Regions:
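Tandem repeat scaffolds
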Residues: 2-178, 191
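A broad, low-specificity signal marking well-ordered, structured residues that form hydrophobic/aromatic
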Residues: 53, 180-181, 255-256
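Short, glycine/acidic-enriched capping/hinge loops at junctions between secondary-structure elements
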Residues: 68, 194-196, 268-269
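Non-catalytic interaction/regulatory modules that flank or connect domains
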Residues: 163-252
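Extended catalytic/binding region for NAD+/ADP-ribose chemistry, centered on the ART fold
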Residues: 247-268
């Protein structure tokens, strides 16, 4: 089962601007409705024809924006802290790497948004409309009611890419010395994926171990995380530290995998 990435998603992984510090001079601190409205009016007036008004790098704190129309704006790398965003409509906005802290997000609309790398940790997600949204690499760990969001067939990266249950599939991982492990995930294995191309399972059978160019075959491979954990051809393997059932806890116990061979190689060799 191959993964289908857009070029923008690949670029987002390779060069995520969230890892670069924002200069203090670029930050805009908005802590009242009046300050927010004044800034919004200014950027709307300054936006070139066809361009999104620039609300990037804003620190928006303690403002009641419930039910507001904030569609078609560029909020990349902004922070909403302690705001009332109940029913706020961000549809069509650029929301990459937005951080949400201590807000009311219930019934918020992110329809058609590019919302990669957002943090929803500890937020109540009840009624958030993600129809048509791309939430690649967004953090839903420790959020509340992640299953009560609204999605549709155009929502990207909310649903798991692997079979959810009752179906076997092939998975891949890259071990020490770039040994590539081909694994069978049986139909009775627990499996989960969050909002990226990686996942975790509770059990695998090692089918084949090769070099990245597939010219060499090996009988074993060593884990890159636990030097005492080995994958051996023909053997059933279970994680030494158990399996975390919460799909949103991405970096947690389980056998981690990719669905695409080249993706696991790129991840390990980047």
């Amino acid at each position: 089962m191959a993964m289908n990435f857009t070029s923008s998603e690949i670029d987002f992984v390779k060069d995520n601007e969230a890892y670069r510090p924002i200069p203090e001079s670029d930050k805009r601190r908005l802590e009242s409705a009046e300050a927010f409205d004044a800034e919004l009016e200014k950027v709307r007036g300054a936006a070139a024809a066809g361009a999104m008004p620039d609300m990037r790098h804003c620190i928006i704190k303690g403002i009641d924006l419930a039910g507001r129309d904030l569609t078609g704006l560029d909020f990349r790398r902004s922070t909403f802290d302690g705001c009332n965003l109940h029913g706020t409509d961000f549809s069509g906005s650029q929301m990459d790497n937005v951080a949400f802290y201590n807000n009311d997000l219930t019934d918020m609309k992110l329809c058609g948004c590019t919302a990669r790398g957002c943090s929803f940790r500890f937020q109540d997600m009840t009624g958030i409309d993600l129809s048509g949204a791309n939430i690649y690499s967004s953090v839903l760990e420790d959020a509340l009611n992640q299953d009560k969001v609204i999605i549709d067939d155009e929502t990207k990266w909310y649903k798991m890419r692997c079979p959810e249950e009752g179906e076997a599939f092939i998975a891949w991982k890259c071990c020490t010395d770039l040994r590539v492990v081909m694994m069978l995930v049986p139909k009775d294995a627990h499996r989960c994926m969050a909002t990226m191309e990686t996942g975790r399972v509770s059990k695998v059978k090692v089918l084949k171990i090769t070099s990245i160019d597939e010219k060499e075959n090996y009988t074993w491979a060593q884990s890159t995380v636990d030097p005492d954990f080995y994958y051996e051809v023909g053997k059933w393997i279970e994680p030494a530290n158990g399996f975390q059932m919460d799909r949103w806890k991405d970096s947690s116990p389980g056998i981690h995998f990719f669905l695409d061979r080249q993706q696991c190689i790129d991840y390990q060799s980047k």
